[in-house]
A protein has these predicted regions:
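Intrinsic disorder at enzyme termini
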Residues: 1-11
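Conserved, non-catalytic sequence blocks in retroelement Pol enzymes and Pol-derived host proteins
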Residues: 36, 61, 129-131
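Buried hydrophobic positions in well-ordered alpha/beta secondary-structure cores of metabolic enzymes
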Residues: 9, 20, 49, 56, ...
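N-terminal capping segment at the start of a domain
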Residues: 20-29
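A short, Trp-centered hydrophobic/proline-enriched beta-strand micro-motif
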Residues: 116-125
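Internal helix-loop-helix
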Residues: 47-117, 158-164
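A short core secondary-structure module
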Residues: 150-192
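A structural signal for short hydrophobic beta-strand segments in well-ordered beta-sheet cores
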Residues: 138-141
Length: 195
C-alpha cells in the first residue's frame, strides 16, 4: 500500500499551511485572549474552500476525503486550535450525518449554510448521561408540526454560534434542527418544536 500523498493532497496541505502561517498565526493569540469567536478566520476559511470540505460536489462542496480534511486541520491546528476545530465541525460530524441520512431538501437547505461559514454543532451531552448515547433520556416525539423535543443538553460546542444542530434523542426517526426555526424553544420549559 502506498502511503504517499497525491499531488492534489500536497497542494491542499500547502494552501492550508500558507493560510495558517500567513493569516491565522498573527490572529490566534488575540482570539485566545478575548475569547471571541474568530469570525475573520471563518471568512478566510470560506474563501479558501475549507468549510464543508466533505460536502458532495453536487451540493457545492469539494467532495473531499476525511484525509483531505485532516491535512487541512493539521496545518491550521499548528497555529490556531479553535480555527482548526471549526474546520473539523464544518466538514465532519453533522455534515457527514446529513450527507448520509439527510433528505435532498435538508441537504439543499443546510449545506449552503456550512459552505457560507456556519459551523454545525452536535447536541449529545446530558446532565445524567454525559455523552453515553445508550443512556440518553432526551426524547423527540411526533407532534402536529413536526417533533417535540423534551430533555436537557449541556456542553454543546458552538451552541451560541451554530444554527444547525444534530440533536441526539430517543426517537424512531431522525431529523435535523436549526436554531431560530427548527428547534426554537416553545413556551413550555425544555420543550422544543422541530420539523
Amino acid at each position: 500500500m502506498d502511503f504517499k500523498l497525491t499531488a492534489a493532497q500536497e497542494a491542499l496541505r500547502l494552501r492550508a499551511r500558507e493560510l495558517a502561517d500567513g493569516t491565522f498565526r498573527a490572529r490566534a493569540a488575540g482570539w485566545d485572549a478575548t475569547e471571541q469567536y474568530p469570525w475573520d478566520n471563518v471568512k478566510d476559511l470560506v474563501r479558501a474552500g475549507f468549510m464543508g470540505l466533505t460536502i458532495p460536489r453536487e451540493h457545492g462542496g469539494a467532495g473531499a476525503s476525511i484525509l483531505d480534511v485532516l491535512l487541512v486541520v493539521e496545518e491550521i491546528a499548528r497555529v490556531c486550535g479553535v480555527t482548526a476545530r471549526i474546520v473539523v465541525e464544518g466538514s465532519l460530524g453533522v455534515v457527514g450525518a446529513l450527507a448520509a441520512y439527510g433528505s435532498e431538501a435538508q441537504k439543499r437547505r443546510y449545506f449552503p449554510w456550512v459552505l457560507d461559514g456556519d459551523k454545525p454543532a452536535i447536541a449529545i451531552t446530558e446532565p445524567e448521561a454525559g455523552s453515553a448515547a445508550t443512556d440518553l433520556v432526551t426524547r423527540a416525539d411526533e407532534a402536529p408540526e413536526g417533533y417535540a423535543i423534551t430533555g436537557e443538553k449541556r456542553w454543546i460546542t458552538g451552541a451560541g454560534t451554530s444554527r444547525l444542530y444534530l440533536v441526539y434523542c430517543r426517537i424512531n426517526r431522525s431529523f435535523f434542527c436549526s436554531r431560530g426555526g427548527v428547534g426554537k424553544p416553545s413556551s413550555t420549559p425544555r420543550l422544543f418544536r422541530a420539523s
